[in-house]
Amino acid sequence: MESFLFTSESVNEGHPDKLCDQISDAILDACLEQDPESKVACETCTKTNMVMVFGEITTKANVDYEQIVRKTCREIGFVSADVGLDADNCKVLVNIEQQSPDIAQGVHGHLTKKPEEVGAGDQGHMFGYATDETPELMPLTHVLATKLGAKLTEVRKNGTCPWLRPDGKTQVTIEYINESGAMVPVRVHTVLISTQHDETVTNDEIAADLKEHVIKPVIPEKYLDEKTIFHLNPSGRFVIGGPHGDAGLTGRKIIIDTYGGWGAHGGGAFSGKDPTKVDRSGAYIVRQAAKSIVASGLARRVIVQVSYAIGVPEPLSVFVDSYGTGKIPDKEILEIVKESFDFRPGMISINLDLKRGGNGRFLKTAAYGHFGRDDADFTWEVVKPLKSNKVQA
């Protein structure tokens, strides 16, 4: 059987784009914690010695935006200009306005509409994906790239590798076999890690530490062999990083946030958006639908699409493709999905409890992926029993 190579990348929490995602979601958390009806569309950008938050927020919450920005930067590890940003001394700019009254009346009637009547906050189409190649029902390339990034941060923060700095990127290439539409990983072909570091460490020390403390604990031994290629800081030097090295912006890592290039993406980012924004809530409900299909045994691999019009509660379309792995025709899987899931934005918010902030709930989603996470706050990862007599017991 012929094999092929597929690659997914990730970035860790100190990447400037991910820093912005986390600030936007920390602000969303703070608003929802005090006022679950908050309407939030919060963007963040950053460059050397500066963070700016801007957008539209209508809330009864009393939120100190500057304090949230500095706290988020500090907790990631941006505590001095040497590492890319000084949380306590950088400039923080805030330009937040209220939600447009035109949008407010069309979507939620200035909070007068019942949940089932709440319209989509904008037009758009979202995709959910699931595959049986990992316990998380996520693509292995994405899972490993994401876990490598998380491990980089762990060994930096716990002091195992004190030379590490916050910024970093990972990439994993895997050799696959297509088994009648299902994806079967054979081996890891290439591992790439580029991580920010201090001036004192040598490239040999970097490579040795990354293999021992990052790659070894994350990638199962069965996927590594003598032919596996390792590119460890291949540029040779990565001292300047974070916002000092590159500008950052909310919503620029949407493939990392989802499925690592597998499935499809409608283009809408997640972070800084309350659940009336179907870019987020729509993507969450179709992930739950896709995961539930695979977990129930109806298919080994599946993609689900939903689409919306602004101000309209009911979706315009729902689509299912099982890539030929379905135990029953896709048309029948689609009917089961439509019967089992309520795609109206107001009902998604209720059924997935998306108006609940606090506990760093959405902040947690903003680094290391929104899907495939084992965390009670990730309610869309709960497999839902499907309404059909064709589902495996």
Curated annotation (Swiss-Prot):
It comes from the Eukaryota. Its cofactor is Mn(2+); Mg(2+); Co(2+); K(+). GO terms for molecular function: ATP binding; metal ion binding; methionine adenosyltransferase activity; mRNA binding. It is an enzyme of class 2 (transferase). GO terms for cellular component: cytosol; nucleolus; plant-type cell wall; plasma membrane; plasmodesma. Pfam families: S-AdoMet_synt_C, S-AdoMet_synt_M, S-AdoMet_synt_N. Keywords: ATP-binding, Cobalt, Cytoplasm, Magnesium, Metal-binding, Nucleotide-binding, One-carbon metabolism, Potassium, Transferase. One of its GO terms (biological process) is lignin biosynthetic process. K(+) binds at residue 43. The lineage of its organism: Eukaryota, Viridiplantae, Streptophyta, Embryophyta, Tracheophyta. Belongs to the AdoMet synthase family. ATP binds at residues 15, 167-169, 235-238, 246, 252-253, 269, 273, 277. Its EC number is 2.5.1.6. Homotetramer. Binds 2 divalent ions per subunit. The metal ions interact primarily with the substrate. Can utilize magnesium, manganese or cobalt (in vitro). This is S-adenosylmethionine synthase 4. Catalyzes the formation of S-adenosylmethionine from methionine and ATP. The reaction comprises two steps that are both catalyzed by the same enzyme: formation of S-adenosylmethionine (AdoMet) and triphosphate, and subsequent hydrolysis of the triphosphate. Pathway: Amino-acid biosynthesis; S-adenosyl-L-methionine biosynthesis; S-adenosyl-L-methionine from L-methionine: step 1/1.
